[in-house]
């Protein structure tokens, strides 16, 4: 029997908190399920909604001024959401509402509300780079890698972009300045800060509080536009979440990383924003070209890649004094693939203290082998490298999440060989190891190369797991 509790049965304070929140006397089941949430519920109840409404209006004025929404509509949407629990009787939905409201009342002001107050002065820190001088070199390098054959019958997934991306980008530019200890950017926007001729879409970010930020942003968009906003988690991308609107249009995504990982990511400071060091980004680009899908992207729009690569090449030339004279020495390092066991052996003794690197193409096999080694010194850099690294008895063990291209039966294509070398160099940069001579040789090994057709490629590691999501409108959290 679902009876109403009487005041002699339950502690008066807890009952009163729940009763005030629900605007009704809770059932016995509701009381027992919600009593441990009393502290969060009380914070929600005493939260100053008027100040919150004011902050959202200021955010709207600054970042979403072109969205046709009145102040009264924004207020009504906010008050409606903060009273939603009064018309909700499903315990699971009540828990979701409490969790999301708790995020708003405890974090919104510090995360997004702060963007409405006067910002610190921007410290101009740009260096003038001569990107034009690198364009021909970048084009030559990319042309030799433009070897993918596009299957016109292949159905490509469409990436629909929301019209709100430009508004969110404006907000993100300020967010990156205010929260530059916990959020950094990479990709096209970061290169745009170096070279204003770079075109960019959404802003790619790494941060230490991704889930909280995305929830706050999703509600800001919901309150301003009235649209249902959905947050999705993709199982095969580590700690990745994306915000989409009700029509599945992409708004923004983010990777979450630990603070200790954030601390070691190489970065530079431009106009109060930290961006991932373009040297590191260049290595990631070289690594990603081992992915067959990325080569298909190159084939479709080579000029987009050329602008980015030229920018990064000029950065490494200026910063590290790299001389592009074609002297490659031992690059790319020798790579031998065991297709049955899906392991590539890279000979590293010419450059590093460890004599070879065993690159696993299946992450669970690597994890099992590391356990068998009884070694506890592996480094996990999360989505920054999509891999752990371990050096044990002069051998590096690591995982490579991309495809391996073959130029002939059993022969690793030089594009993938360079990608594997870049993957090892990422570790060297993250651990403050030596990498500059190896970097110079790697980049010079990309010069004056003929196109080599792709014979075949390995399949990517299949990641288990299910998609997760937060649906604000339906009060559902599945993770």
Curated annotation (Swiss-Prot):
<feature type="binding site">
    <location>
        <position position="204"/>
    </location>
    <ligand>
        <name>Ca(2+) 1</name>
    </ligand>
</feature>
<feature type="active site">
    <location>
        <position position="202"/>
    </location>
</feature>
<comment type="similarity">
    <text>Belongs to the poxviridae poly(A) polymerase catalytic subunit family.</text>
</comment>
<keyword id="KW-0067">ATP-binding</keyword>
<keyword id="KW-0808">Transferase</keyword>
<dbReference type="InterPro" id="IPR038337">
    <property type="entry name" value="Poxvirus_polyA_pol_cat_N_sf"/>
</dbReference>
<protein>
    <recommendedName>
        <fullName>Poly(A) polymerase catalytic subunit</fullName>
        <ecNumber>2.7.7.19</ecNumber>
    </recommendedName>
</protein>
<dbReference type="InterPro" id="IPR004976">
    <property type="entry name" value="PolyA_pol_cat_Poxvir"/>
</dbReference>
<feature type="binding site">
    <location>
        <position position="253"/>
    </location>
    <ligand>
        <name>Ca(2+) 2</name>
    </ligand>
</feature>
<dbReference type="GO" id="GO:0046872">
    <property type="term" value="F:metal ion binding"/>
</dbReference>
<dbReference type="Pfam" id="PF12629">
    <property type="entry name" value="Pox_polyA_pol_C"/>
</dbReference>
<keyword id="KW-0244">Early protein</keyword>
<keyword id="KW-0507">mRNA processing</keyword>
<dbReference type="InterPro" id="IPR037265">
    <property type="entry name" value="PolyA_pol_cat_sf"/>
</dbReference>
<comment type="subunit">
    <text>Heterodimer of a large (catalytic) subunit and a small (regulatory) subunit.</text>
</comment>
<feature type="binding site">
    <location>
        <position position="204"/>
    </location>
    <ligand>
        <name>Ca(2+) 2</name>
    </ligand>
</feature>
<feature type="active site">
    <location>
        <position position="204"/>
    </location>
</feature>
<keyword id="KW-0547">Nucleotide-binding</keyword>
<feature type="binding site">
    <location>
        <position position="202"/>
    </location>
    <ligand>
        <name>Ca(2+) 2</name>
    </ligand>
</feature>
<keyword id="KW-0804">Transcription</keyword>
<dbReference type="Pfam" id="PF03296">
    <property type="entry name" value="Pox_polyA_pol"/>
</dbReference>
<keyword id="KW-0479">Metal-binding</keyword>
<dbReference type="GO" id="GO:0006397">
    <property type="term" value="P:mRNA processing"/>
</dbReference>
<feature type="binding site">
    <location>
        <position position="202"/>
    </location>
    <ligand>
        <name>Ca(2+) 1</name>
    </ligand>
</feature>
<dbReference type="InterPro" id="IPR038419">
    <property type="entry name" value="PolyA_pol_nucTrfase_sf_Poxvir"/>
</dbReference>
<dbReference type="GO" id="GO:0005524">
    <property type="term" value="F:ATP binding"/>
</dbReference>
<dbReference type="GO" id="GO:1990817">
    <property type="term" value="F:poly(A) RNA polymerase activity"/>
</dbReference>
<dbReference type="Pfam" id="PF12630">
    <property type="entry name" value="Pox_polyA_pol_N"/>
</dbReference>
<keyword id="KW-0106">Calcium</keyword>
<dbReference type="InterPro" id="IPR024231">
    <property type="entry name" value="PolyA_pol_nucTrfase_Poxvir"/>
</dbReference>
<comment type="function">
    <text>Polymerase that creates the 3'-poly(A) tail of mRNA's.</text>
</comment>
<dbReference type="InterPro" id="IPR024398">
    <property type="entry name" value="Poxvirus_polyA_pol_cat_N"/>
</dbReference>
<dbReference type="InterPro" id="IPR024397">
    <property type="entry name" value="Poxvirus_polyA_pol_cat_C"/>
</dbReference>
């Amino acid at each position: 029997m679902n009876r109403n509790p009487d005041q002699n049965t339950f502690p008066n304070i807890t009952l009163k908190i729940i009763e005030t929140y629900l605007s009704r006397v809770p059932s016995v089941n509701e009381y027992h399920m919600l009593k441990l949430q009393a502290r969060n519920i009380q914070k929600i109840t005493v939260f100053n909604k008027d100040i919150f409404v004011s902050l959202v209006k200021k955010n709207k004025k600054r970042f979403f001024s072109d969205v046709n929404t009145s102040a009264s509509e924004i207020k009504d949407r906010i008050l409606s959401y903060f009273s939603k629990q009064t018309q909700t009787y499903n315990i699971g939905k009540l828990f979701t509402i409490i969790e999301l409201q708790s995020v708003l009342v405890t974090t919104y002001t510090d995360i997004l509300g702060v963007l409405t107050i006067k910002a610190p002065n921007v410290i101009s820190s740009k260096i003038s780079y001569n990107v034009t001088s690198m364009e021909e070199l970048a084009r030559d390098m990319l042309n030799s890698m433009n070897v993918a054959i596009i299957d016109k019958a292949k159905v490509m997934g469409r990436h629909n972009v929301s019209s709100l991306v430009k508004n969110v980008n404006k907000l993100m530019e300020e967010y990156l300045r205010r929260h530059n200890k916990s959020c950094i950017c990479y990709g096209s926007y970061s290169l745009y800060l170096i070279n204003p001729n770079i075109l960019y879409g959404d802003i790619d970010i790494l941060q230490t509080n991704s889930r909280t930020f995305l929830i706050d942003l999703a509600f800001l968009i919901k309150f301003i536009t009235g649209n249902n906003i959905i947050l999705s988690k993709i199982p095969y991308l580590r700690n990745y979440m994306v915000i989409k609107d009700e029509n599945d249009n992409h708004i923004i995504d983010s990777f979450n990383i630990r603070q200790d990982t954030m601390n070691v990511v190489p970065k530079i400071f431009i106009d109060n924003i930290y961006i991932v060091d373009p040297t590191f980004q260049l290595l990631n680009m070289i690594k990603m070209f081992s992915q067959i899908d990325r080569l298909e992207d190159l084939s479709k729009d080579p000029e987009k890649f050329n602008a980015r690569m030229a920018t990064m090449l000029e950065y490494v030339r200026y910063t590290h004094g790299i001389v592009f004279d074609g002297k490659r020495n031992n690059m790319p390092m020798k790579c031998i693939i065991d297709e049955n066991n899906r392991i590539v052996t890279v000979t590293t003794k010419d450059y590093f203290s460890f004599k070879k690197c065993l690159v696993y193409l299946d992450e669970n096999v690597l994890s099992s082998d590391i356990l068998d080694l009884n070694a506890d010194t592996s480094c996990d850099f999360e989505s920054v490298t999509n891999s752990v690294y371990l050096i044990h008895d002069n051998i590096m063990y690591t995982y490579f999440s991309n495809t391996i291209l073959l130029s002939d039966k059993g022969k690793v294509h030089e594009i993938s060989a360079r990608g594997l070398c870049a993957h090892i160099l990422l570790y060297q940069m993250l651990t403050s190891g030596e990498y500059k001579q190896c970097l110079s040789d790697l980049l010079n090994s990309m010069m004056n190369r003929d196109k080599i057709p792709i014979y075949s490629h390995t399949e990517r590691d299949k990641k288990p797991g299910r998609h997760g999501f937060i649906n604000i409108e339906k009060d559902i959290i599945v993770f």
